[in-house]
From Swiss-Prot:
Residues 456-469 have a biased composition (Polar residues). It comes from Homo sapiens (Human). This is Cyclin-dependent kinase 14. Its EC number is 2.7.11.22. Pfam families: Pkinase (PF00069). Serine/threonine-protein kinase involved in the control of the eukaryotic cell cycle, whose activity is controlled by an associated cyclin. Acts as a cell-cycle regulator of Wnt signaling pathway during G2/M phase by mediating the phosphorylation of LRP6 at 'Ser-1490', leading to the activation of the Wnt signaling pathway. Acts as a regulator of cell cycle progression and cell proliferation via its interaction with CCDN3. Phosphorylates RB1 in vitro, however the relevance of such result remains to be confirmed in vivo. Keywords: ATP-binding, Cell cycle, Cell division, Cell membrane, Cytoplasm, Kinase, Membrane, Nucleotide-binding, Nucleus, Phosphoprotein, Serine/threonine-protein kinase, Transferase, Wnt signaling pathway. Residues 103-133, 449-469 are annotated as: Disordered. One of its GO terms (molecular function) is cyclin binding. Highly expressed in brain, pancreas, kidney, heart, testis and ovary. Also detected at lower levels in other tissues except in spleen and thymus where expression is barely detected. The gene is CDK14. Disulfide bonds: none annotated. ATP binds at residues 141-149, 164. Found in a complex with LRP6, CCNY and CAPRIN2 during G2/M stage; CAPRIN2 functions as a scaffold for the complex by binding to CCNY via its N terminus and to CDK14 via its C terminus. Interacts with CCNY; CCNY mediates its recruitment to the plasma membrane and promotes phosphorylation of LRP6. Interacts with CCDN3 and CDKN1A. Interacts with SEPT8. Interacts with 14-3-3 proteina YWHAB, YWHAE, YWHAH and YWHAQ. InterPro entries: CDK, Kinase-like_dom_sf, Prot_kinase_dom, Protein_kinase_ATP_BS, Ser/Thr_kinase_AS.
Length: 469
């Protein structure tokens, strides 16, 4: 079933600002330990139902996907260009931000944010959780419009952590997106979702303390250009779908899937990150060089102005990332704007109409006269390496559907034949169990690194430990 959520009316903005200030003050009394799972979700609103293929939920959010301005990482441009002319290279950006929403319905049907407050017990003679002096900053990892990420070390247990320091605005208080990220992540316990250890609130900042993960999928692909080892692609994709299935069953969307938001540990574990930190913005009518990359993984329904978001939104991003891992280039690397992005999609999948995508003509930005009329192609014509891997093209084709209702759900994708050669025990793991606890499940050396990573009897992930990110 699909749950539709109506947006809040504009006249509530004033009340929302007052609520932000109240919640900001409440954060000074919140200090959560690693094992505290009682921090509740915030936003509450009405739900109705809708259908989507597999097991999906449609959500119409309070806001839309954010644009990020982060640390740059250079990526390769696809050679499959519908305009058949050279274009300037686009640089991908690393993001600390994105929005993700979980909504519940109150017994009265009215919208009323709720926060349950907890403080963490601590010894007066030892470093405390929830205190800024409990962590040592080691180096800056990235900086966004209102948040900075540092590599840090816990003085409590000596473990490495990632510190997201969010600068607070006096008038607005704690940003709802930061509250949302904290509330969601404290309730999500899964091996393939980044773990939130602690929350620190001061007058000027709100700091979210995460487990430290060595690199992300974007950097990993930059380090291994030309496409990843097929076995590693399968393990990364399996973990991505595992994490998404977990949050989708809880009516949570990630809404900003891209390689920069998928962390890779030194043992090869993939973890979903960046839940709700960014400020929300409208889908832009134009973009700038450091924003254009965020369009690469955005589905055509959103590009065309749809605001009825479902778990199918995330599944489009999965398809794009799957193709990129195999082919070694982004699936749809638009170079200019939304129009260009849609042209690249339609060149491969065909220009939609009411027969292939019922309801497309009602989308705000769909103007048939603006688009070249393309016929759909086999995906291997665009990305030839899909044909080298059993069942890869079929799975990609079921994820990269223009009509959101036709996209495979995360749970259904896990049962696809593409994964049929993996050990059955992978489907029996508990949520917090890593896939690498199953015998014989391990990453393979990427091209050219066998001697470097395995010749000295080292674990695979040690080659990543010196990555700067």
């Amino acid at each position: 079933m699909c749950d539709l959520i109506e947006p809040q009316p504009a006249e509530k903005i004033g009340k929302m600002k007052k609520l932000r200030r109240t919640l900001s003050e409440s954060f000074s009394r919140i200090a959560l330990k690693k094992d505290d799972t009682t921090f509740d979700e915030i936003c509450v609103t009405k739900m109705s139902t809708r259908n989507c293929q597999g097991m999906d939920s449609v959500i119409k959010p309070l806001d839309t996907i954010p644009e990020d301005k982060k640390v740059r990482v250079q990526r390769t441009q696809s050679t499959f260009d519908p305009f058949e002319k050279p274009a300037n290279q686009v640089k991908r950006v690393h993001s600390e931000n994105n929005a993700c929403i979980n909504f519940k319905t109150s017994s009265t049907g009215k919208e009323s944010p709720k926060v349950r407050r907890h403080s963490s017990p601590s010894s007066p003679t030892s470093p405390k959780f929830g205190k800024a002096d409990s962590y040592e900053k080691l180096e800056k990892l990235g900086e966004g419009s209102y948040a900075t990420v540092y590599k840090g070390k816990s003085k409590v247990n000596g473990k490495l952590v990632a510190l997201k320091v969010i600068r607070l605005q006096e008038e607005e208080g704690t940003p709802f997106t930061a509250i949302r990220e904290a509330s969601l992540l404290k309730g999500l316990k899964h091996a393939n979702i980044v773990l939130l250890h602690d929350i620190i609130h001061t007058k000027e900042t709100l700091t979210l303390v995460f487990e430290y993960v060595h690199t992300d999928l974007c950097q990993y692909m930059d380090k291994h250009p030309g496409g990843l080892h097929p076995d590693n692609v399968k393990l990364f994709l399996f973990q991505l779908l595992r994490g998404l299935s977990y949050i989708h069953q809880r009516y949570i969307l990630h809404r900003d899937l891209k390689p920069q938001n998928l962390l890779i540990s030194d043992t090869g574990e993939l973890k979903l990150a960046d839940f709700g930190l960014a400020r929300a913005k409208s889908v832009p009518s134009h973009t700038y060089s450091n924003e254009v990359v965020t369009l690469w993984y955005r589905p055509p329904d959103v590009l065309l102005g749809s605001t009825e978001y479902s778990t199918c939104l995330d599944m489009w991003g999965v398809g794009c990332i799957f193709v990129e891992m195999i082919q070694g280039v982004a699936a749809f690397p638009g170079m200019k704007d939304i129009q260009d992005q849609l042209e690249r999609i339609f060149l491969v999948l065909g220009t939609p109409n009411e027969d292939t995508w019922p309801g497309v003509h009602s989308l705000p930005h769909f103007k048939p006269e603006r688009f070249t009329l393309y016929s759909s192609k086999n995906l291997r014509q665009a990305w030839n390496k899909l044909s080298y891997v059993n069942h890869a093209e079929d799975l990609a084709s079921k994820l990269l559907q223009c009509s959101p209702k036709n996209r495979l759900s995360a749970q259904a994708a896990l049962s696809h034949e593409y994964f049929s050669d993996l050990p059955p025990r992978l489907w029996e793991l508990t949520d917090m169990s890593s896939i690498f606890t199953v015998p014989n499940v391990r990453l393979q050396p990427e091209a050219g690194e066998s001697m470097r990573a395995f010749g000295k009897n080292n674990s695979y992930g040690k080659s990543l430990s010196n990555s700067k990110h």
